[in-house]
Amino acid sequence: MSQSEKENQGSGEGKTQDMAIFSPPVVRSGAGALNRALFTKTVNLAAAAVNDNRLISKYRKELEHSKELLRQDRLSPIVNHPDKALADQGKKCLLLSPNVKAPEPETWGAALKEGVQKKELSVIPYELQLNYDYWTYHDIITSILPEELHDDIPSGFNTAGHVAHMNLRERYIPYKKVIAEVILDKTTNIRTVINKVDNVGAESEFRTFQYEVLAGPDDMQVQVTENACSFEFDYSKVYWNSKLEAEHRRLINMFEPGEVVCDVMAGIGPFAVPAGKKGVFVWANDMNPESNKYMQVAINRNKVSQYVRPICEDGRTFIHHAADSVLEAHKNGEHVLIAPKPPSRAKKAPKPEPKRVDIPPTISHFVMNLPATAIEFLGCYRGVYAGHEDLFSAESGRKLPLVHVHCFSFKADDETPLNDICERITKYLGFPVKPGNPDVEGEVAVHDVRDVAPAKRMFCASFRIPREVAFAERV
Ligand SMILES: C[S@@+](CC[C@H](N)C(=O)[O-])C[C@H]1O[C@@H](n2cnc3c(N)ncnc32)[C@H](O)[C@@H]1O
């Protein structure tokens, strides 16, 4: 081996650092209480003590370039000198790669050797102390769980404000408390960890769930911000899913200021409140009285009471009631007045009049986010505008409402889910539909929203209510 080859090998160039030394100790404490003190470790390294602090940045760059500097996630290579007296004088060290050994100059690379030769550096042993705070959730849990559980370490959870909501698989249940404690320690802004309690697949009518608190206080009163609106609610009493923010935004972006939107299953208002904020009139219904209560809270918090009306009834009856009530509001001349921007003080222009926006006579969009069953409500559109063909005459320029109905279907790359969804819409609407352009009567646009299970996805189907359905006689 030539001298340069020896030097190369010694300096760690071309060699991967042995990073296993930074793994936490294996603490197979079982399902018992989490003992954070067991997660301490001393890693023996070498460090380049820098004689003059003004040279730190120069040597940091050089040693980084020659791959002699320690590169390890969440560890700064610049540390205080291990000698307390020198540290008190402000002396610093640069931590070196584990391949570099202080007593073995043949492991030092050219940059290090040169620094030592110039008496600007000295290479010293350094005992790096690592503890529980250093390691990630994954590191700690891997260290605790037995190896047969390493293949699918629980990592995902929903959050609602300070609450992390887990849905642990059966085989991780014995470790639920330890897992929750570590999540609590390692996730900023999480104060409570809960686990969904299996209720043998049965979902509650209001899409709430049974849970047990695994770590932190049993405090389910949460605050969240979504689409620039703030919500405060009891997460145990109403439905909330932070993973739907993009879907909420997608539909909100379709609504125009001054239009009317009827949200049939509005929850606490993640469609309604931001839509109201952009000047859309919203009739926001939910059958859960708790949702209705917290929607009112959100309306007040976000100052959208001029635009958003909370209603609490069965969505099936709401559909006709909403069409009638919007028309009534229009006939009564209900409107909002939008205060103009104050004129600049320099101009002595007369104060501009507020802008009046009337509630239009008809609904532009219905939203139905209750994916498990909403399609079954579609029969309720029959007769929604019975006797009101005039409202949608060619001269009026008005179109029948678009319905956006959420649903579940298969996960497949072909047309299977589209055809499945269209078949079910056909059945419940009582009118044949096929995949296509929602502006064409009898055609449906299907948007793929998100994965919900290995073989199941959530979709949103959008279509205009067919004339035959809208103008049918009410029974
Ligand atoms: C999946 S959540 C969606 C809530 C909200 N739209 C969202 O995106 O977060 C479905 C909502 O439907 C409400 N709900 C269930 N059955 C209903 C019915 N028959 N009529 C009206 N609302 C209903 C539940 O209370 C729940 O808030």
Curated annotation (Swiss-Prot):
GO cellular component: cytoplasm; mitochondrial matrix; nucleus
Molecular function GO labels: tRNA (guanine(37)-N1)-methyltransferase activity; tRNA methyltransferase activity
Catalytic activity: guanosine(37) in tRNA + S-adenosyl-L-methionine = N(1)-methylguanosine(37) in tRNA + S-adenosyl-L-homocysteine + H(+)
Keyword set, alphabetical order: Cytoplasm, Methyltransferase, Mitochondrion, Nucleus, S-adenosyl-L-methionine, Transferase, tRNA processing
Residues that bind S-adenosyl-L-methionine: H248, D286, M287, D314, G315, N369
EC number: 2.1.1.228
Keyword Chloroplast: no
Annotated SUPFAM superfamilies: S-adenosyl-L-methionine-dependent methyltransferases
Similarity section: Belongs to the class I-like SAM-binding methyltransferase superfamily. TRM5/TYW2 family.
Oligomeric form and interacting partners: Monomer.
Described purpose of this protein according to its UniProt entry: Specifically methylates the N1 position of guanosine-37 in various cytoplasmic and mitochondrial tRNAs. Methylation is not dependent on the nature of the nucleoside 5' of the target nucleoside. This is the first step in the biosynthesis of wybutosine (yW), a modified base adjacent to the anticodon of tRNAs and required for accurate decoding.
Name of the protein in its database record: tRNA (guanine(37)-N(1))-methyltransferase
